[in-house]
Amino acid sequence: MLTKTKSDEIKTQKDSTTGSYWITTFGCQMNKADSERMAGTLEKMGYTRADNELNADLVLYNTCTIRDNAEQKVYSFLGRQAKRKHKTPRLKLVVAGCLAQQEGESLLRRVPELDLVMGPQHVNNLENLLGKVDLGNQVVATEETFISEDITSARRESSICGWVNIIYGCNERCSYCVVPSVRGKEQSRYPNAIKSEIQKLADDNFKEITLLGQNIDAYGRDLPGTTKEGRKENTLTDLLYYIHDVKGIRRIRFATSHPRYFSKRLIQACYELDKVCEHFHIPFQSGNDEILKQMSRGYSIKKYKNIIENIRSLMPDASITADAIVAFPGETEKQYQDTLKLISEIGFDQVNTAAYSARPNTPAAVWTNQLSEEVKKARLQEINDLVEKTARSRNQRYIDNIESVLIEGLNPKNSSQIMGRTRTNRLTFVEIPKNINFNFSLGDEINVRINEARPFSLTGELSL
C-alpha cells in the first residue's frame, strides 16, 4: 500500500467529518455488487447518499477497464470533479475497481486531486483506507491481498433481488482479457459464509439471489477437500444443493459461466433444483475454433454446442444468453461469418457483443494483425442486427403463454405498468388492471399472459 502526504495545493482539510456520498458504477455485475458493499460501508460510517454527485462530499467511481471507451468515460468524469475540488477542498475523490488496479499510482500523476485509489480486492477495507485519507494522505491500495470475508452490510439497490459474490478473481489467461491482472487470482468463499449471507437476505425478505463470479463454475477449485471419486468437494453444483433449502428465497441464478467448466452434473442439478432458474449465461466469444484457440479459451465450438444441447435436452425452454467479440486480431471474413452462423444455429435469447478493444498487458494487444476501426464498426453493427432479429424471434415463443413474473417495481416510464422478470430472465411489463381490485407488493409472483414480444422484453396482462 502506498501512502503519500498530500501537497499543500491539493490537500483536503484534515477532518474526519463525513457528510454525503455518491457512487457511479461502470461495468459488470461484480462491480455493481462491490458498489453496494462500499455504499453500505459509507453509510455505516455516517455518510448519507447525496441527490447527485455535484452535491456530494465524497465521490467514488467504481471503474471498468474491459474496453477503452469505459476508461475514457471515467477520465471525463474525473476531470469535472478535479475542477470542482479546487473550489471545494473538502471533497474526497475516490477511484475504485479495475481501472484503479490497472493504473495504480500513475492515476495520482494524471489526476493529482485524487484522495484514494483502490483495487477490487480492497473493497471491504474502504473504512480503514478513508481513515488514512482523513489524516491528510493520498492512498493507493492495489497490492494483491487475501480478500477479507464479505461481512459488510451492503446497501442493496433492490429490496427483492440480491447479488452474492461466491468467487473473486480469475485464473484464466484469455489473450484479450485484462481481468486476471486487475481482479487477481481466484478466491472462493466458504459455503457456510455464502449460506449465511443468503439467509440474511431471506430474513430481509429478499426473494431472488444471483450468485456472482468472473468464472462462477470454477468455484471451489481453490478450496480444500476432495471426494472419494477424486473430484473437488466444493463445486458450484455442490453449493447449489447446499443453499437450496434457505426458506424465503424463491429463485436462484448464477453468472458468469465458462464453457470449459460447465459440466453435465451442473446441468442435472439445475434441472432437479426447483429454485434454480432456467437461464444460463455462457459466453462463447467466437464461433470459430481457430479464433478460440488464439483467444486461449480452452474449448471448441463442438464442446460449446454439446453444452447447449445438454441443457435443452432437460430444459427445452431455457433461456441461453452469451457474450461475443468481433474483429479479434486477424479474424477473417469467414471466421467472422462462423460467429454469425453459431448465433443463428443456437438461437440465443440475447448476446452481449463488443468489437475487440486492445487492453494493456494482454498478449493480443501487441499483435500486428489488428483490424481497422471501419471493419470493427461494420461487423459490430451486423452482429447486433442479427442478435436483435434472433432475440425477437425467440421471444415470440412466449406469446399466449402464462408466465410467472416476480414483481420488482413500477415501470419507470409508464406508471400504469408493473415490471418484473420471468424465470428465464425476460424483462416483463404488466398492465395494472383497472376493473378489479388488484393489490400487489414487491416480491410477489404473479401469473401473466404474454400478449406482446419485443427483442428484449415482453408485455402481458394479469392472468386470473
UniProtKB/Swiss-Prot annotation:
Lineage, highest ranks first: Bacteria, Bacillati, Cyanobacteriota, Cyanophyceae, Synechococcales
A Pfam family reported for this protein in Swiss-Prot or TrEMBL: Radical_SAM
Record keywords, A-Z: 4Fe-4S, Cytoplasm, Iron, Iron-sulfur, Metal-binding, S-adenosyl-L-methionine, Transferase, tRNA processing
GO terms for cellular component: cytoplasm
Cofactor: [4Fe-4S] cluster
Residues in Radical SAM core domain copies: 156-394
Top-level taxon of the source organism: Bacteria
Gene expressing this chain: miaB
Organism annotation: Prochlorococcus marinus (strain MIT 9301)
Protein name: tRNA-2-methylthio-N(6)-dimethylallyladenosine synthase
